[in-house]
């Protein structure tokens, strides 16, 4: 859409003193500020309620085409629009039937005229134009809702007739507590039959077993099996990892039962030990590392020769290696010229169907 710049000498005939301006259509124009070097500005009035001459709307949108290069004020001579000669304010305050504009401007006129814009927001960048836009919140009120960027973690909600109120996107839920174990943190909250909150563990336990989850953890299974009044009939011990029975049915400890099973004789009492000796069927990596850390400087065993890390012979340094060009003959396939493989011609579908083979 093209807009022509209106100078101060050509008054607009559409705006008369009769007050017949339309209130339904939006008026848009491009006006200059009186000088050749002055930037042009595009202004659009949301609703024109002109009774006399041209009057500014309560909501006036100003879109500067580029920032002023000078720091001095911009003189304007808009006598045709009912404006006296002077410094033009980019945010004029206009009185209307709806009341004065109480929302503060996004940028003050003094800082806009005297200060220079940052390089990232020059030449009508989208960020700058989006910041200058103002929209009416409601036709019944005069509050303006500035369209400025907000923080992604804070949501600002504007109410009609009131200011914005900040709400956090991550609001904390009500404090919940498991009625069984008293836990306050769980990946999933459940409910019992009466509607009370249960943590995920207590809820699953009650669902599977039909009873409340016990608060005291059960003790681990005892490694040493103890029976009241039970003794080995051979060594008379009452502590063992496994109780067995001999041929006559008498209880025996694990050691005596295994010894009799392997040798068919009773285990001698001289082999009895106070402690229970166990063996590790699989040596864990932790025990290996522990042994290596205990003896890091253990000398090698006598009579055991470690294999050489160089299987092709001792290591030779630079200058000690003899010339070996006359000893090694190049492989035979390196001397032959490379062969060029010719692929068979492709047979098309029509030739295969007709039975004609290519030459």
From Swiss-Prot:
Gene Ontology molecular functions: DNA-binding transcription factor activity, RNA polymerase II-specific; RNA polymerase II cis-regulatory region sequence-specific DNA binding; zinc ion binding
Zinc fingers, GATA-type class: 178-202, 232-256
CDD domains: ZnF_GATA (cd00202)
Residues making up the signal peptide according to the UniProt record: none
Chain positions covered by the region annotation Disordered: 1-21, 271-311, 323-359
Pfam families named in the record: GATA
Tissue expression as described in the entry: Expressed in the developing ventral blood island, and in both tadpole and adult erythrocytes.
GO annotations of cellular component type: nucleus
GO biological processes: cell fate commitment; erythrocyte differentiation; negative regulation of transcription by RNA polymerase II; positive regulation of transcription by RNA polymerase II
Residue spans of biased composition, Basic residues class: 279-291
Cellular compartments annotated: Nucleus
Keywords, sorted A to Z: Activator, DNA-binding, Metal-binding, Nucleus, Repeat, Transcription, Transcription regulation, Zinc, Zinc-finger
Function: Transcription factor that acts synergistically with tal1/scl and lmo2 to specify embryonic dorsal mesoderm to a hematopoietic fate.
Protein name: GATA-binding factor 1-A
Organism: Xenopus laevis (African clawed frog)
């Amino acid at each position: 859409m093209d807009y022509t710049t209106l100078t101060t000498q050509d008054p607009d005939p559409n705006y008369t003193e009769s007050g017949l301006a339309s209130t339904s259509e939006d008026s848009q124009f491009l006006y200059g500020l009186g000088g050749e070097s002055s930037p042009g500005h595009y202004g659009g009035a949301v609703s024109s309620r002109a009774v006399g001459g041209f009057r500014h709307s309560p909501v006036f949108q100003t879109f500067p085409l580029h920032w002023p290069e000078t720091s001095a004020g911009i003189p304007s001579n808009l006598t045709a629009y009912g404006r006296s000669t002077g410094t033009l304010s980019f945010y004029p305050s206009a009185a209307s039937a709806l009341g004065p504009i109480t929302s503060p401007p996004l940028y003050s006129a003094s800082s806009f005229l005297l200060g220079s814009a940052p390089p990232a927001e020059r030449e009508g960048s989208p960020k700058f134009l989006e910041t200058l836009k103002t929209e009416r919140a409601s036709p019944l009120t005069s509050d303006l809702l500035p369209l400025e960027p907000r923080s992604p973690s804070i949501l600002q909600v504007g109410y009609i007739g009131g200011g914005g109120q900040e709400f956090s996107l991550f609001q904390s839920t009500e404090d919940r507590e498991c009625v069984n174990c008293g836990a306050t943190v769980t990946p999933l909250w459940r409910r019992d039959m009466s509607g009370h909150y249960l943590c995920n563990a207590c809820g699953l336990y009650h669902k599977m077993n039909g009873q409340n989850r016990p608060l005291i953890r059960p003790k681990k299974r005892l490694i040493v099996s103890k029976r009241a009044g039970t003794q080995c009939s051979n060594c008379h011990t009452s502590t063992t990892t496994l109780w067995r029975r001999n041929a006559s049915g008498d209880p025996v400890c694990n050691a005596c039962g295994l010894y009799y099973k392997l040798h068919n004789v009773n285990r001698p009492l001289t082999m009895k030990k106070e402690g229970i000796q166990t063996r590790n069927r699989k040596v864990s990596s932790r025990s290996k590392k522990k042994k290596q850390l205990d003896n890091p400087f253990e000398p090698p065993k006598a009579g055991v020769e470690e294999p050489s890390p160089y299987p092709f012979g001792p290591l030779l340094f630079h200058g000690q290696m003899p010339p070996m060009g006359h000893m090694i003959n190049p492989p035979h396939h390196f001397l032959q010229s490379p062969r060029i493989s010719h692929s068979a011609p492709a047979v098309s579908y029509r030739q295969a169907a007709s039975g004609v083979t290519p030459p």
